[in-house]
């Protein structure tokens, strides 16, 4: 009996020792598998939003900092190369809005902010300004890892970037006979890819190649159209913190504008649309006319035929006459993109005059811009010019 008790106690001590070691090993394993350890094997792209990529499986992650939660970012998407029959083409500005990241338990939600309505802040009605006005929930992504200080959150964004959750990509051009409409099909997840991560202090960009599949498509221009690629660039931009002054649109004059409805107004037409305009500031505010602190710079893309470059440059600089009437001297400057430039015209940090020669272009010229939807401030612009404009083919 005594011997049995001794053996039992020895066995119990041994079991408890194993349990303690196992628990310690588990804690060590959990610690080793923390955020920092997980990121060690990933490629880091430092910028506005820190991005990490697993070069083995191609998965892409956002590292969201605590001070980036609830913060507004400008979101912009444009086509790098498309298919005219699917309503997309190079330089096509696809989408523009404001998003923010919201922590919800073990998820990070990505909200698209509704900026269509405004209130007079002195009116008591403004206290109910969120009533029945809904933001759009783009996606909700599980937090993969959290820093020990709980101020950094890692989310995988691969599926987000390779879907139409951020923006609807294709819109088929209208045709009277629906049977003649080109049907691009659906996104092929295994064929689509994140081709590039481009990160800067003020914007985080991704170049995505979407492949759409539709086995029933007939050839276009003698090309197999069952699998079609559309390349686009997503940009997440730091919200501008400056002294830009919005300007309400005068309905008697045509402007590109941000639509705003004042829900506290008694006016029968309570519209306070904000015009899209550049942020120009006089260097010498005391003078009636002054050069700007930062001029508007347009680049002539290196795809532009040599004989056209002086003509294009002079045409753009002619806008300085109008700007001078508004008080700005040399508001616009024009430069030529070098052939060996290390940046592409798809980089939103540059305003570019671009030339293309497409098989079936939808226009001769096209001049879009993207803005801060809250204020109307133009953040960038491109001018697309097609060779067909000159050849008239």
Language model region names:
Residues 310-317, 321:
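Solvent-exposed, polar/charged alpha-helical surfaces in well-ordered, non-transmembrane soluble domains
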